Amino acid sequence: TAEYECARYIGISAQYLGGNDQVYLSAMRRHTELKYGENPYQSPSAMYADNRINPDPLGLDQFTQHKGHTLSYINATDLDRLINSITHIAAGFEKNFGNVPFIALGAKHSNSCGGAVGETAVQAIERMIEGDLRAIFGGVIIINAVIDVPEATAILKHKMDGENDRLLDAIIAGGITDEALAIIKRVKLRVLTNPALLTLSIDSLEQRSKLRPVRGGLLINPQPNFVLDLSAEEITGTGEINEQQKRDIILAWGIGSTSQ
């Protein structure tokens, strides 16, 4: 802890004396050891975090894990990408319609493989699954709602034949009840919650600079936080689009703009 604090204050001093754009230093605490890296042989692997100054309520270290195996590197990148996607969709709906619907997304290897909005959490979940019944197999699901028995049942059973539950790697939500946890039987299935998912808005977009390690250094770039505004003068087209088509456009934009 003392070494961490010293490193952090040395970094702040160097940035102040050298000019904020001339020096980049970062000190983070080890938050958790990951099950394995991007591939099983890439171990050890870990997640570091620093939320002591201007904490991010949607930071990966702010999620509580209720059951399942330890997160892997791919689980962490999937979660990060899903947070990026769901916050962009929420921002788009708030800007264009003044409210944020229930949003359900599924992802595999950091890209969405299903996405839907609904008037209820169950409706959003079922629509997301119905987009491609096979694509969600083994994937990660995120929903900006509290999961109770109806939501858990939809996630595990909707459009499934027989008694088997849908095979998933992780479920992420704003919260989950004990009753819902009780019907999630698969030991490996990771379940994580963060109440910040329940209050998504345009302010939920990532604000910190985007960092990318490159050989010999680091690239720093502002976050791509453009939010599509369908009323903007620059947007032109032929004919009129109805309200449902506008909602479809915002959903498609939110997913497409945050996919690799």
Predicted regions and their residues:
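ATP-dependent carboxylate/acyl-activation modules
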Residues: 1, 5-259
